[in-house]
Amino acid sequence: MNTRIIPALLGALLFSGVAEAAPSIYPVDTARFLGGSRFDFKVEFDGELAEKDAKVLINGQDAKAVLDAKPEFIAKEKGADASALLLRGASLKPGQYKVTVESPTGKASANWDVYGTPDKPVAKNVILLIADGLSMGHRTSARLMSKGVTNGMYNGKLSMDTLPYTAMLGTCSVDSIAADSANTASAYMTGHKSSVNALGVYADRTPDSLDDPKQETIAELLRRTTGKSIGVVSDAEIEDATPASVVGHTRRRADKAEIVDMFYSVKPDVIIGGGSAYFLPQNVPGSKRKDNKNYVEMFQKEGYALATSNTELSKAVKGNPDKLLGLFHTGNMDGVLDRKFLKKGTVSKFPDQPDLTDSMRAALSVLSKNPEGFFLMLEAGLVDKYSHPLDWERAVYDTIMFDKVVAMAQEFCDKNPDTLLIVTGDHTHSISVIGTVDDNLPGELMRDKVGIYAEAGYPAYKDRNGDGYPDDVNVSKRLAVFIGNYPDYYETYRPKMDGPFVPSVKDEKGHYIANAAYKDVPGAQLRIGNLPRTESTGVHSIDDLVVGARGPHADAFRGFMNSTEVFRIMSEALALGNK
């Protein structure tokens, strides 16, 4: 080769690899959202410029005029050393829109599909039931443990198995193929995709987690355009990602004190869950607030009946309240395996926590009083909380509990056929049933006691009292369930009878290593993790979700769908478009 042309070739290659700086547009390209819903429009330029040099058009017209919102031009955005254009509270009529941005620092474009809804609603009520992290492995394990199998045939179905319409949901994020509960639940509540850890916003470049471009949630939309009641129920902290998605706007899901203020702003008629530590002023023992606001008292002054135990919840419901605040734990509540059977976790400290079925019953009692209807989001949050630390038995017992809530919802739908019921998770875990573990099989290693294929046979769970739960989780022949991603940990092949599983602990280098507390469990096997050593538990998988539905417009769930379609179907059923 002629060496004299090498510099020229290198120069050409380097030049071709340099991308032109491009502004960022929010809502993002490919966004599909509801006509008439509110959103913040933002353009982030890649350098400082004068407002007159920024050309922002929507379908060839000035964006400020099209969006009918007050613009704010930021000459130098904090932390960016670049300019931005921001319009808060914009809305659009249904149609196809193309946004084009040109400036001395670069150009960009985005296409939006803004959809409408029918003029008249087909549903009066919407019940959205979410088991956080619900995966096929949870469902299969719950059916095996709760119903059993005879000669290859299940002895019964889960209630969620009987929903007539099903689809697969994709949960990818704006910034990643992976997702967390914040932005997956937010997709259901806003119809917009978002970024990992974000709630009701497009994550922008500013350091402030609370100033990002907002997406109106279904609760805000209902408050603004209807007289319907709103309910939010969880057995996790009520400020946690999934329940927070009903009202929240933050780039950082950990802004839990601020999320309580967002609950207070929207004021759902029913708020039930854990997380009282963020409602109480900082001078109260156990509070996690950094101010003196007492949101318990503030909600009570707004007419909310208060319950802090299951006994108080029953009493409050008998009082026929119009609004209900139930806070039963300073943090996440305990799952059914600990509450009902083992009495571990924090049950001794919080002995009178309601079951999720109790919370569902209370919520329906209050919400169904409204002749204009209601929207209820209920989360079984601990399915995820236990799946992360590989504590699959606790996760599956809570899946069985969740299915009891589904059965209650179906009974409500039987009596109220104008109710759309949607049942799903918000993301998945890589959990699978691969056979059984039989303590009576020979072998020194527990792995040799794992039965696969024909050797699996059937587990020995019994449900003599007919409550749907195995009477004993620690039977001699039990399910072999494994999760496909994990930190270093000791696999014991047994349920954790002494309390929730803590698979790993941090060493002096800041890496997570297997928790030696399980090292001497007979037959325990050290498993070297397949995740980065910064991870203490398993993580979410990117597998598709299953969604089931019944009621008005449930037939819209079919095939594969993006998770944002859940919002669209709810909006269509309630005719919320362009109000």
Positions of the model-derived regions?
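Gram-negative bacterial Sec-dependent N-terminal signal peptides
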Residues: 1-20
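Short, compositionally biased P/S/T/A/G/V-rich stretches that sit at domain boundaries
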Residues: 21-34
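Active-site nucleophile/metal-coordination loop of metallo-enzymes that catalyze phosphate/sulfate
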Residues: 23-24, 48-52, 67-68, 74-76, ...
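Aromatic/hydrophobic beta-strand junction motif of beta-rich domains
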Residues: 39-47
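Aromatic sugar-binding surface patches on proteins
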Residues: 71-86
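Short, aromatic- and glycine-rich surface loops/edge beta-strands on solvent-exposed regions
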Residues: 94-104
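Edge beta-strands of extracellular beta-sandwich domains
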Residues: 107-116
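A post-motif C-terminal structural segment
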Residues: 134-139, 143-186, 240-578
